[in-house]
C-alpha cells in the first residue's frame, strides 16, 4: 500500500500542510508554529493542551519540534483514529453524518441539544453546503485538534456552544457519565470553588458596600458609593472593607456540594424514562437544588450579614456572633429572611437561563457563519448580561432578605415580616427604595466574572482537567 495513488495523495497533502505550518522554513514545526496553524486552520481559539499533546505525541526525538517524517507519522495515526470516530458517529453507515446523527450521539452522552444547535454544529464543518459532513470535511476539521474519542469530539462541540455562568450558579453544571467516571466532575467543582473564593475576596469591599447601603441607606440617610466607603473606612479602617468575607468564602464548599448532590437526585426523579432534561426541567431541578442548599446553609447567610454589618469590637469572631444571636434572639433568628431568599431563586434562575439562551441563539444565528464557536469574550458577555438581568428581577427580594436578617441588630428598628417590610419600604421610599445598593452590585459583576474565569481556567490546568 505504500506506493498506492491514495498514499501518494495523502503524503502530498501532509507535505503541503507541513509547509504551511513551518512559517520560518527551518524544516521543523514547533509548538508556536502549531499554535498559529491551529488558530488559522481551526477557525477558533486553539487548545494549549492540544498543541502540547500533538508535539509530545509526534516528536520521536524530543527536540522541541516535528520534522516532516515525524509530522507525517503523527498524521497517519491521527487519520486512522478519526476514521474510527467518523464511523462511530455515522450510525446508518452511508458515509455522511447528518443532523439527526449528531443529536443521537449527544443523547447517548446524556446531553440534550435542539435541532437548531445541531444544525449550527454541522454548519461549522460543512464546506460544500450539503448539510451533511463527509469524511474529508470531518478529517480536515479535526485533524489538528487533540481529541481522542467520540466523547471528546462531542464535548469539543458542547463547550464551544454552551457556557452557563451565574452569580451563585443557581442552576448547577451538567456533568456527563464520562466526567463522573474519570473524576473530572469533582475537579471542576474544586476549581469553581477556588475561583469563587478568589473572586469574592477580590470584590468583597463592593459586596460589603452593597449590604451597608441596603440596610442603612434611605431618604433621610442618602448614602452614595463614595460616602459609604468613606464611612466604613473611618469606622474600622481599610481592613473593615473585608468584614464578612471569611464566612462568605467558607460557605462556598458546603453550598456547592449540597446543590450538586440535590440536583443529581432531583434530576433522576424528573427524568424517569427520558434520556435528558429539557431547559425548563433543568430550571426546575436547578431551582429546587438551590432551595435545598439554601435551606441547609441559610444560618451562614444570616451570620454573613451580621458580620458584614458589625461595628469594630462588636463580635470576637464567627462563633461569638453565632452564640450571641442564639442567646438573645433564639434559633429562629438564623432563618430570618428565608422566605424572600428562596422566592428570589425563581426569578433569578429563570431570567438568567432564559436571557442567556436567547443571547446565545441570537449570536449563533447572526454571526456563526464559519464556526459555531463564539469565543470566550462573547460567552462571558452573554453570561454577564444574563446574570445582571436576573439580579435586577430578584434584587427587591434580596434587599428585603438582607433587611430582615439585619433588623434585630439595629437598635430601635421595627421587627417586620416580609410583606410588612415591603409595604414599609414602598410607603417611605417608593420603588427606588427596593433598589438601594444596586450600583455597587452592578460594579462588581464584571470584575467578579473576569477573576472567576481566569482563576477557574488556571485551577483546571493545575488539577489536570482537560479544556476543550
UniProtKB/Swiss-Prot annotation:
<feature type="binding site">
    <location>
        <position position="24"/>
    </location>
    <ligand>
        <name>Ca(2+) 1</name>
    </ligand>
</feature>
<feature type="binding site">
    <location>
        <position position="101"/>
    </location>
    <ligand>
        <name>Ca(2+) 2</name>
    </ligand>
</feature>
<dbReference type="Pfam" id="PF13499">
    <property type="entry name" value="EF-hand_7"/>
</dbReference>
<dbReference type="GO" id="GO:1900069">
    <property type="term" value="P:regulation of cellular hyperosmotic salinity response"/>
</dbReference>
<feature type="domain" description="EF-hand 2">
    <location>
        <begin position="77"/>
        <end position="112"/>
    </location>
</feature>
<protein>
    <recommendedName>
        <fullName>Mitochondrial adenyl nucleotide antiporter SLC25A23</fullName>
    </recommendedName>
</protein>
<dbReference type="GO" id="GO:0051282">
    <property type="term" value="P:regulation of sequestering of calcium ion"/>
</dbReference>
<dbReference type="GO" id="GO:0015867">
    <property type="term" value="P:ATP transport"/>
</dbReference>
<feature type="binding site">
    <location>
        <position position="96"/>
    </location>
    <ligand>
        <name>Ca(2+) 2</name>
    </ligand>
</feature>
<feature type="topological domain" description="Mitochondrial matrix">
    <location>
        <begin position="207"/>
        <end position="243"/>
    </location>
</feature>
<feature type="topological domain" description="Mitochondrial intermembrane">
    <location>
        <begin position="457"/>
        <end position="468"/>
    </location>
</feature>
<dbReference type="GO" id="GO:0071277">
    <property type="term" value="P:cellular response to calcium ion"/>
</dbReference>
<feature type="binding site">
    <location>
        <position position="90"/>
    </location>
    <ligand>
        <name>Ca(2+) 2</name>
    </ligand>
</feature>
<feature type="transmembrane region" description="Helical; Name=6">
    <location>
        <begin position="437"/>
        <end position="456"/>
    </location>
</feature>
<feature type="binding site">
    <location>
        <position position="94"/>
    </location>
    <ligand>
        <name>Ca(2+) 2</name>
    </ligand>
</feature>
<keyword id="KW-0050">Antiport</keyword>
<feature type="repeat" description="Solcar 1">
    <location>
        <begin position="183"/>
        <end position="269"/>
    </location>
</feature>
<feature type="region of interest" description="Linker region">
    <location>
        <begin position="150"/>
        <end position="159"/>
    </location>
</feature>
<dbReference type="GO" id="GO:0000295">
    <property type="term" value="F:adenine nucleotide transmembrane transporter activity"/>
</dbReference>
<dbReference type="GO" id="GO:0002082">
    <property type="term" value="P:regulation of oxidative phosphorylation"/>
</dbReference>
<keyword id="KW-0812">Transmembrane</keyword>
<dbReference type="GO" id="GO:0005347">
    <property type="term" value="F:ATP transmembrane transporter activity"/>
</dbReference>
<feature type="binding site">
    <location>
        <position position="22"/>
    </location>
    <ligand>
        <name>Ca(2+) 1</name>
    </ligand>
</feature>
<dbReference type="GO" id="GO:0051561">
    <property type="term" value="P:positive regulation of mitochondrial calcium ion concentration"/>
</dbReference>
<feature type="region of interest" description="C-terminal transmembrane transporter domain">
    <location>
        <begin position="165"/>
        <end position="468"/>
    </location>
</feature>
<feature type="region of interest" description="Disordered">
    <location>
        <begin position="34"/>
        <end position="67"/>
    </location>
</feature>
<feature type="binding site">
    <location>
        <position position="92"/>
    </location>
    <ligand>
        <name>Ca(2+) 2</name>
    </ligand>
</feature>
<feature type="topological domain" description="Mitochondrial intermembrane">
    <location>
        <begin position="264"/>
        <end position="286"/>
    </location>
</feature>
<feature type="domain" description="EF-hand 3">
    <location>
        <begin position="113"/>
        <end position="148"/>
    </location>
</feature>
<keyword id="KW-0813">Transport</keyword>
<dbReference type="GO" id="GO:0051503">
    <property type="term" value="P:adenine nucleotide transport"/>
</dbReference>
<feature type="compositionally biased region" description="Acidic residues">
    <location>
        <begin position="58"/>
        <end position="67"/>
    </location>
</feature>
<keyword id="KW-0106">Calcium</keyword>
<dbReference type="GO" id="GO:0140988">
    <property type="term" value="F:ADP:phosphate antiporter activity"/>
</dbReference>
<dbReference type="GO" id="GO:0005743">
    <property type="term" value="C:mitochondrial inner membrane"/>
</dbReference>
<keyword id="KW-0496">Mitochondrion</keyword>
<dbReference type="InterPro" id="IPR002067">
    <property type="entry name" value="Mit_carrier"/>
</dbReference>
<dbReference type="InterPro" id="IPR011992">
    <property type="entry name" value="EF-hand-dom_pair"/>
</dbReference>
<feature type="transmembrane region" description="Helical; Name=3">
    <location>
        <begin position="287"/>
        <end position="300"/>
    </location>
</feature>
<dbReference type="GO" id="GO:0015866">
    <property type="term" value="P:ADP transport"/>
</dbReference>
<dbReference type="GO" id="GO:0005509">
    <property type="term" value="F:calcium ion binding"/>
</dbReference>
<keyword id="KW-0472">Membrane</keyword>
Amino acid at each position: 500500500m505504500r506506493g498506492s495513488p491514495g498514499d501518494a495523495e495523502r503524503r502530498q497533502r501532509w507535505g503541503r500542510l507541513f509547509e504551511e505550518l513551518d512559517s520560518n522554513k527551518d524544516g521543523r514545526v514547533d509548538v508556536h508554529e502549531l499554535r498559529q496553524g491551529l488558530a488559522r486552520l481551526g477557525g477558533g481559539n486553539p487548545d494549549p493542551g492540544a498543541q502540547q499533546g500533538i508535539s509530545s505525541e509526534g516528536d520521536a526525538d524530543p527536540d522541541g519540534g516535528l520534522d516532516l517524517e515525524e509530522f507525517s507519522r503523527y498524521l497517519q495515526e491521527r487519520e486512522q483514529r478519526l476514521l474510527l470516530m467518523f464511523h462511530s458517529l455515522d450510525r446508518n453507515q452511508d458515509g455522511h453524518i447528518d443532523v439527526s446523527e449528531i443529536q443521537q450521539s449527544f443523547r447517548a452522552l446524556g446531553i440534550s441539544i435542539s435541532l437548531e444547535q445541531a444544525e449550527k454544529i454541522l454548519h461549522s464543518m460543512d464546506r460544500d453546503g450539503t448539510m451533511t459532513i463527509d469524511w474529508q470535511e470531518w478529517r480536515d476539521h479535526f485533524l489538528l485538534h487533540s481529541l481522542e474519542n467520540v466523547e471528546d469530539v462531542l464535548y469539543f462541540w458542547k463547550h464551544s456552544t454552551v457556557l452557563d455562568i451565574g452569580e451563585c450558579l443557581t442552576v448547577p453544571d451538567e456533568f456527563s457519565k464520562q466526567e463522573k467516571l474519570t473524576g473530572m466532575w469533582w475537579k471542576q467543582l474544586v476549581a469553581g470553588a477556588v475561583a469563587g473564593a478568589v473572586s469574592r475576596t477580590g470584590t468583597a469591599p463592593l459586596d460589603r458596600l452593597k449590604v451597608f447601603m441596603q440596610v442603612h441607606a434611605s431618604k433621610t440617610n442618602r448614602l452614595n458609593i463614595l460616602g459609604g466607603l468613606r464611612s466604613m473606612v473611618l469606622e474600622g479602617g481599610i481592613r473593615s472593607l473585608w468584614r464578612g468575607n471569611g464566612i462568605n468564602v467558607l460557605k462556598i464548599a458546603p453550598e456547592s456540594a449540597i446543590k450538586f448532590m440535590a440536583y443529581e437526585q432531583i434530576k433522576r426523579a424528573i427524568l424517569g424514562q427520558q434520556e435528558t432534561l429539557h431547559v425548563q426541567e433543568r430550571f426546575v431541578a436547578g431551582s429546587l437544588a438551590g432551595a435545598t442548599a439554601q435551606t441547609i446553609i441559610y444560618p451562614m447567610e444570616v451570620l454573613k450579614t451580621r458580620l458584614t454589618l458589625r461595628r469594630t469590637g462588636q463580635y470576637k469572631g464567627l462563633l461569638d456572633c453565632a452564640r450571641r444571636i442564639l442567646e438573645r434572639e433564639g434559633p429562629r433568628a438564623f432563618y430570618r429572611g428565608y422566605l424572600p431568599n428562596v422566592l428570589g431563586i425563581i426569578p433569578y434562575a429563570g431570567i438568567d437561563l432564559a436571557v442567556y439562551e436567547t443571547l446565545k441563539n441570537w449570536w449563533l444565528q447572526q454571526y456563526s457563519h464559519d464556526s459555531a464557536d463564539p469565543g470566550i469574550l462573547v460567552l462571558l458577555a452573554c453570561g454577564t448580561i444574563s446574570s445582571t438581568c436576573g439580579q435586577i428581577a430578584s434584587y427587591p427580594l434580596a434587599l428585603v432578605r438582607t433587611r430582615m436578617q439585619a433588623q434585630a441588630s439595629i437598635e430601635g428598628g421595627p421587627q417586620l415580616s416580609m410583606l410588612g417590610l415591603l409595604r414599609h419600604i414602598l410607603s417611605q421610599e417608593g420603588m427606588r427604595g427596593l433598589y438601594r445598593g444596586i450600583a455597587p452590585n452592578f460594579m462588581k459583576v464584571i470584575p467578579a466574572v473576569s477573576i472567576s474565569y481566569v482563576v477557574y481556567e488556571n485551577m483546571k490546568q493545575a488539577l489536570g482537567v482537560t479544556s476543550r
